[in-house]
């Protein structure tokens, strides 16, 4: 029995990607490199992880990787770097708004295609990561939640720091 079909999943996944895009587009230049929170002494990610631009990149990077379903053989498109694969890494150079918006469009298309062509066999393919393993379809629900979490953090930051109102996207087109 099918409970959620491809179109339902895409409309909601696309909506969270669109809201992330709103945050990236609406960020004033003076906040692009500002941190949402202070670094922690025991964090395993690079110092500066919570910079607005980097949190956007982090979200897109993992969206792309999780749509692939495996770390092995994954590489983000140029000019982006592999990140967060090893403790103690350094931050990549600051990516521009335009670069991140192009990556967002790339990920949006990849997500729509991945969901639209997802077969029963692909949905149940087991995906393994350092933090655990789960079927590919469940990984996409995890992925959606991850994009929503960071998109909401960025939008809340813009509301607090720049008085920007977030527009709710109920469904992607």
What are these regions (language model features)?
Residues 13, 17-20, 24, 104, ...:
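Hydrophobic alpha-helical core bundles mediating ligand binding, dimerization, or RNAP-core interactions
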Residues 28, 71-76, 114-123:
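Proline-centered turn/helix-capping motifs that create local helix->coil transitions or kinks
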Residues 10-14, 18-21, 33-86, 128-173:
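Short, contiguous alpha-helical
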Residues 1-7, 173:
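Basic/polar N-terminal segments that are highly enriched at the extreme N-terminus
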Residues 87-127, 135-150:
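Acidic/histidine-rich alpha-helical segments that form the ligand environment
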């Amino acid at each position: 029995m099918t409970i959620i079909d491809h179109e339902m999943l895409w409309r909601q996944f696309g909506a969270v990607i669109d809201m992330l895009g709103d945050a990236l587009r609406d960020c004033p230049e003076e906040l692009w490199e500002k941190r949402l929170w202070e670094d922690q002494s025991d964090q395993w990610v690079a110092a500066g992880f919570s910079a607005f631009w980097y949190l956007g990149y982090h979200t897109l990077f993992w969206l792309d990787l999780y749509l692939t379903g495996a770390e092995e053989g994954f590489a983000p498109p140029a000019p982006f770097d592999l990140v967060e694969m090893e403790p103690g890494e350094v931050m990549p150079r600051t990516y521009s708004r335009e670069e991140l918006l192009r990556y967002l469009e790339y990920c949006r298309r990849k997500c729509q295609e991945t969901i639209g062509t997802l077969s029963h066999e692909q949905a149940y393919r087991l995906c393994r990561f350092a933090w655990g393993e789960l079927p590919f379809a469940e990984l996409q629900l995890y992925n959606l939640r991850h994009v929503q979490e960071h998109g909401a953090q960025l939008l809340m930051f813009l509301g607090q720091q720049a008085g920007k109102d977030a527009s709710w996207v109920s469904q992607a087109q």
